């Protein structure tokens, strides 16, 4: 079997799908994208296709190493996202050829279900509470919320009080009937993170995500030493080498690699194993589409330390398409009691509605994240 063609489809709301075709008619799908930089990743995918056309798709490990090491310059969000989507599609092909789900090819199940959580948008307490109520009706009891709006490098007590007030109202509204993590989104400087985390401790969040930016990772162990709240990070780390430094330094309790950013299934399985050796849990980052989610689920079901799975059903980013709009076998992604079951169909287990993908790709938007500014007009972290 040989790879004959690679096609990319930019799609709403902010996704990109990839299709790999073979000379035997077996097709694999992947999801390579950086939110807001889809065209750049698309260019990287097509540059990498020179290494793939005419090659045997079953040699996943070799093709991964070729894509990573054949260029003198490597790593980073663009290249690793391109590799990630290609890698997902290669695993999809392998599973279809062998008539087995990807998790079966990786040694089989370590669990029968995985807890899902949902992102809840909004900065006003009333909006967040309404969002949680809606999601609870469809079975969720675990959520992730914005931990704060933009903060200055050193900000005033009013800004801290506003963030804490939102969390306090949510805990008061639901008590211990729900669990929620708080996403700082890298918006908070190290000095302000120290202040804000301490003020949030009485409300016992499940975790605090990206308390500071990944490039400030030296602060993770310092912040962790000052709080009992587990710290989470990883969506802006792109290879096992990025994660190695964080694991060695300590401080992170929950690792969040993104299967569409950090080299795909091949790389993230290695990252999961590294995390387990450090007694760090796994909760893959996934605010993206159905192929990315499927890839995450296969890792979850073969990784002992996987504890939570993010998913984007109903997320406020989903303008123009919902999580399962391009999927034919929607029932396979149904949740029971807030848990996902293993995907049982061969490969990734996603049946893509290709005609719909082609139609929606014709006028796909170029999504950009908001550009925020502080009161003094300097650029703020989003």
Swiss-Prot record:
<protein>
    <recommendedName>
        <fullName>D-galactonate dehydratase</fullName>
        <ecNumber>4.2.1.6</ecNumber>
    </recommendedName>
</protein>
<dbReference type="GO" id="GO:0009063">
    <property type="term" value="P:amino acid catabolic process"/>
</dbReference>
<keyword id="KW-0479">Metal-binding</keyword>
<dbReference type="InterPro" id="IPR034593">
    <property type="entry name" value="DgoD-like"/>
</dbReference>
<feature type="site" description="Increases basicity of active site His">
    <location>
        <position position="258"/>
    </location>
</feature>
<feature type="site" description="Transition state stabilizer">
    <location>
        <position position="310"/>
    </location>
</feature>
<dbReference type="InterPro" id="IPR029065">
    <property type="entry name" value="Enolase_C-like"/>
</dbReference>
<comment type="function">
    <text>Catalyzes the dehydration of D-galactonate to 2-keto-3-deoxy-D-galactonate.</text>
</comment>
<dbReference type="InterPro" id="IPR013341">
    <property type="entry name" value="Mandelate_racemase_N_dom"/>
</dbReference>
<comment type="pathway">
    <text>Carbohydrate acid metabolism; D-galactonate degradation; D-glyceraldehyde 3-phosphate and pyruvate from D-galactonate: step 1/3.</text>
</comment>
<dbReference type="GO" id="GO:0008869">
    <property type="term" value="F:galactonate dehydratase activity"/>
</dbReference>
<feature type="active site" description="Proton acceptor">
    <location>
        <position position="285"/>
    </location>
</feature>
<keyword id="KW-0456">Lyase</keyword>
<dbReference type="Pfam" id="PF13378">
    <property type="entry name" value="MR_MLE_C"/>
</dbReference>
<dbReference type="GO" id="GO:0000287">
    <property type="term" value="F:magnesium ion binding"/>
</dbReference>
<feature type="binding site">
    <location>
        <position position="183"/>
    </location>
    <ligand>
        <name>Mg(2+)</name>
    </ligand>
</feature>
<keyword id="KW-0460">Magnesium</keyword>
<dbReference type="InterPro" id="IPR023592">
    <property type="entry name" value="Galactonate_deHydtase"/>
</dbReference>
<feature type="binding site">
    <location>
        <position position="209"/>
    </location>
    <ligand>
        <name>Mg(2+)</name>
    </ligand>
</feature>
<dbReference type="InterPro" id="IPR029017">
    <property type="entry name" value="Enolase-like_N"/>
</dbReference>
<comment type="similarity">
    <text>Belongs to the mandelate racemase/muconate lactonizing enzyme family. GalD subfamily.</text>
</comment>
<dbReference type="GO" id="GO:0034194">
    <property type="term" value="P:D-galactonate catabolic process"/>
</dbReference>
<dbReference type="InterPro" id="IPR013342">
    <property type="entry name" value="Mandelate_racemase_C"/>
</dbReference>
<dbReference type="Pfam" id="PF02746">
    <property type="entry name" value="MR_MLE_N"/>
</dbReference>
<dbReference type="InterPro" id="IPR018110">
    <property type="entry name" value="Mandel_Rmase/mucon_lact_enz_CS"/>
</dbReference>
<dbReference type="InterPro" id="IPR036849">
    <property type="entry name" value="Enolase-like_C_sf"/>
</dbReference>
<feature type="binding site">
    <location>
        <position position="235"/>
    </location>
    <ligand>
        <name>Mg(2+)</name>
    </ligand>
</feature>
<feature type="active site" description="Proton donor">
    <location>
        <position position="185"/>
    </location>
</feature>
């Amino acid at each position: 079997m040989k790879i004959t063609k690679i096609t990319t489809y930019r799609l709403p709301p902010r996704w990109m799908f990839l299709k790999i075709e073979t000379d035997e008619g077996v097709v694999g799908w992947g999801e390579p994208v950086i939110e807001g930089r889809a065209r750049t990743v698309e260019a990287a995918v097509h540059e990498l296709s020179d290494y793939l056309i005419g090659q045997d798709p079953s040699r996943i490990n070799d093709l991964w190493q070729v894509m990573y090491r054949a260029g003198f310059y490597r790593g980073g969000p663009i290249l690793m996202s391109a590799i990630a989507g290609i890698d997902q599609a290669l695993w999809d092909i392998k599973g279809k050829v062998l008539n087995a789900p990807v998790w079966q090819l990786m040694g089989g199940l370590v669990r029968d279900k995985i807890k899902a959580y949902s992102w809840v948008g909004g900065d006003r307490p009333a909006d967040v509470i309404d969002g949680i109520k809606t999601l609870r009706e469809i079975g969720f009891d675990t959520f992730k919320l914005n931990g704060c709006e933009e903060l200055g490098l050193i900000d005033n007590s009013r800004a801290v009080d506003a963030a804490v007030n939102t969390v306090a109202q949510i805990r008061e509204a639901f008590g211990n009937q729900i669990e929620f993590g708080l996403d700082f989104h890298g918006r908070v400087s190290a000095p302000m993170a120290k202040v804000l985390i301490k003020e949030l401790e009485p409300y016992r969040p499940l975790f605090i995500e990206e308390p500071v930016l990944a490039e400030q990772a030296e602060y993770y162990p310092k912040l962790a030493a000052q709080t009992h709240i587990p710290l989470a990070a990883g969506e802006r780390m792109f290879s096992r080498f990025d994660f190695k430094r964080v694991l060695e330094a300590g401080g992170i309790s929950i690792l969040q690699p993104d299967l569409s950013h950090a080299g795909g299934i091949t790389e993230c399985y290695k990252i999961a194993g590294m995390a387990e050796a450090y007694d760090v849990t796994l909760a893959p980052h996934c605010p993206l589409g159905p192929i990315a989610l499927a890839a995450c689920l296969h890792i979850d079901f073969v990784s002992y330390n996987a504890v939570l799975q993010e998913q984007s059903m109903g997320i406020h980013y989903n303008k123009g398409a919902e999580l399962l709009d391009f999927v034919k076998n929607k029932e396979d992604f149904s949740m029971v009691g807030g848990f996902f079951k293993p995907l049982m169909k061969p490969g990734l287990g996603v049946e893509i509605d290709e005609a719909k993908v082609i139609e929606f790709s014709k006028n796909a938007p170029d999504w950009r994240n908001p550009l925020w500014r502080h009161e003094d007009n300097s650029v703020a972290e989003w």
